[in-house]
């Protein structure tokens, strides 16, 4: 319980990115809407099969399940496992040739079933990436059912018009027969392999009516399926999704670390992203994922390993469900193109991984204050955050700058005796303290 409270605060403090100053006076609380959100200890690990093994990735991931679980993972998300297309291909795993066949480089249906069963035995759920908006150009549907695709005035199948994706053909969701074939394929992996849900790629590109129909039918097979929408619009949640991307918060987080916005701006984005979310639904929060890592690693985005850790703390502890992207746990220093195969040693930085696991343990321990009153502070480069519920409270202070700073402890907490969760000792909080670069304190009462 104690670890929970402190961890949460710590993460919030980490919001403040390095180098950005805030115009608000020190210690002025920023209003945060007091709404109840679903309490959840969910932690999602996004596994890119192409960095686990050049061949037989399902077996390679299975061999890593203990390590993945040790990070605190409760949900294993496998990036697309389907057979990829070749015609006009750029080697993207999101270019699907056959929805009911697997990428043979990853393994067999038996291998996938063994991976899912092994994850279940360890108490983890498994969700698959699902690409509903488009297929590869050599998908059999293109020649057998051209009316299942969007066509131009001359009857030619076209790529998605709103995206520069020339390697894929745009599906026509006005065609009810195509919709049912898609739903049938989604049901296939639930019934044949026993998966626990889907992460739905480019969910905003697919009509709401399809998602409502598909999710309703899928839940006749398993009412507890987890459905994650890659999209930012709150309206997606009305279709049956449980989780929605925190895109805007992530963009603001990167801007903050780049010195392009203030801490106040970041707090405001956190608030605005949560407005209008239906009860029982949450945002997925992340400091990186496969798209972001293909552009720049967290090490490059947030000012080194310590900066990257602070960004992870922030996204994990403020609000929502945390995501870990495979390679993030070893502080991989360079961009990582998910179109390519290339094995990464995911045990190469165990100290960093262990710290991430500690943060996740703190996240899971925060149940005593989850849903409690949140107060955030602007204190220069130090993010400060306090959450209280009943007799429990958590204060986190995080120096997000790569330099030592002197910072005032929030006035209402100065002089209190609280437990330093990391050190395991009781301390009387001073009025002013010195914090080393990226240093953080987590206090519990």
Feature roles, as predicted:
Residues 397-401:
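Asparagine-centered strand-capping/turn motif at beta-strand->loop junctions
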Residues 30-75, 79-193, 213-222, 226:
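Substrate-binding/active-site clefts of carbohydrate-active enzymes
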């Amino acid at each position: 319980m104690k670890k929970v409270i402190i961890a949460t605060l710590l993460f919030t403090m980490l919001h403040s990115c390095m180098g950005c100053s805030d115009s608000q006076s020190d210690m002025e609380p920023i209003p945060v809407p007091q709404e109840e959100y679903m309490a959840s200890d969910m932690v999602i690990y996004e596994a890119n099969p192409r960095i686990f093994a050049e061949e037989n990735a399902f077996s390679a991931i299975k061999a890593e399940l203990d390590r993945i679980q040790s990070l605190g993972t409760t949900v294993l998300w496998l990036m697309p496992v389907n057979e990829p297309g070749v015609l006009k291909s750029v080697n993207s795993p999101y270019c699907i040739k056959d929805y009911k066949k697997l990428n043979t480089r990853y393994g067999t249906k038996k291998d996938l079933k063994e991976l899912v069963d092994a994850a279940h035995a360890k108490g983890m759920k498994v969700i698959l990436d699902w690409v509903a908006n488009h297929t590869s150009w050599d998908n059999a549907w293109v020649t057998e059912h051209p009316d299942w695709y969007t066509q131009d005035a001359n009857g030619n199948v076209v790529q998605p018009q709103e995206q520069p994706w020339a390697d894929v053909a745009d599906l026509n969701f006005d065609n009810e027969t195509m919709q049912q074939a898609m739903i049938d394929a989604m049901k296939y992996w639930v019934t044949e392999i026993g998966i626990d849900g889907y992460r739905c790629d480019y969910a905003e590109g697919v009509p709401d009516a399809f998602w409502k129909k598909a999710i309703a039918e899928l839940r006749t097979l398993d009412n507890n399926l987890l459905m994650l929408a890659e999209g930012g619009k709150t309206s997606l949640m009305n279709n049956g999704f449980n989780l929605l991307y925190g895109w805007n918060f992530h963009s603001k987080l990167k801007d903050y670390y780049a010195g392009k916005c203030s801490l106040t701006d970041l707090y405001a984005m956190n608030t605005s992203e949560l407005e209008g979310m239906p009860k029982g639904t949450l945002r997925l929060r992340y400091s990186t994922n496969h798209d972001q890592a293909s552009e720049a690693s967290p090490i490059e985005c947030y000012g080194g390993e310590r900066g990257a850790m602070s960004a992870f703390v922030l996204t994990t502890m403020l609000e929502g469900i945390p995501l870990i992207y495979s390679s993030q746990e070893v502080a991989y220093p360079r961009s990582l193109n998910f179109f390519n195969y290339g094995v990464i040693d995911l045990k190469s930085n165990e100290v960093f991984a262990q710290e991430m696991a500690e943060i996740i343990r703190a996240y899971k321990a925060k149940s005593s204050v989850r849903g409690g009153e949140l107060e955030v502070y602007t204190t220069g480069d130090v993010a400060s955050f306090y959450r209280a519920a009943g007799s429990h409270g958590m204060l986190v202070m995080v120096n997000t700058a790569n330099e030592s700073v002197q910072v005032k402890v929030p006035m209402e907490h100065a002089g209190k005796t609280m437990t330093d969760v990391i050190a395991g000792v009781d301390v009387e909080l001073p009025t002013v303290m010195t914090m080393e670069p990226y240093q953080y304190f987590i206090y519990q009462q």
